[in-house]
Amino acid sequence: LLIEQAINHNVRNVVIGNQKLFHSVKEHLAPLGINVMGGNDSITQYISTSTDIDLLLTAMVGFSGLEPTLAGISRGLTVAIANKEPVVAAGEIIMRMAKEHNATILPVDSEHSAIFQALQGEHSPIENIFLTASGGPFLNTPVEELEKVSVAQAINHPRWKMGKKITVDSSTLMNKGFEVIEARWLFDVAPHKIKVLVHPESIIHSMVSFSDGSIIAQMNMPDMRLPIQYALTYPKREFLNIPRVDFYKLGALTFNEPDLSKFPLLRIALEALDKGGNTPCILNAANEVAVEAFLQERIK
């Protein structure tokens, strides 16, 4: 896919993090005059030294995205963050560095993009943030059946097409816990002001309330192309050919409180945020190991 994208978009430089695939990528692209680099260190080095980066979009899986993100921020770049783990593990550092280096942070996660969009043009303090959650594939699964679920079931999300790791996190609601931590740092909001709502339709992606009782919601059909494009074209909006919300067919929107006894990882994530320090970083590391073990069917 990387080779295909590089050719289709006529790029000048390609960095492949997986060293095992470096030679294969180079064999295909070097004859076309494309400079190919290998290894995660090369990604960070390129970001740190390149003079032709207009916008940096970090979409690496897990904690590996932290160093490239910090490299872009230290350059004062506009950084669109698509992977939440760096913000979960080092949100305070990221936002402090962004302020010091006058870097712009654009959230790509659908919920945080929704909050960001709702805040455009607003100068009043936030009263509350409402983070919506679809509830994942096991929303209506009895608790006693959860220990029997398969990998195939856990990565079959009812609303979103995503990578395996984030889909498993969505199944356990750990993803939503991470998003609460992320929102705390991205928008400088006290944890108790961030509420999670289970919203199975996934039409409202987040809401922001203000001191006068107003609530601003961002809505669209569940499609990641919208928040991705918004980050790439910000502050402009460009036409996007995705299905529009049909309120007549939709009929109703539902909201429920998350069941923390059924989905304890959300509770653990909220506790980690309250505890602070390096606790969210430890939680992120433990979760990455556990999810990988689950995907390899070594744990249930």
Language-model features: locations:
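Catalytic, metal-anchored helix/loop core of enzyme active sites in primary metabolism
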Residues: L1-K300
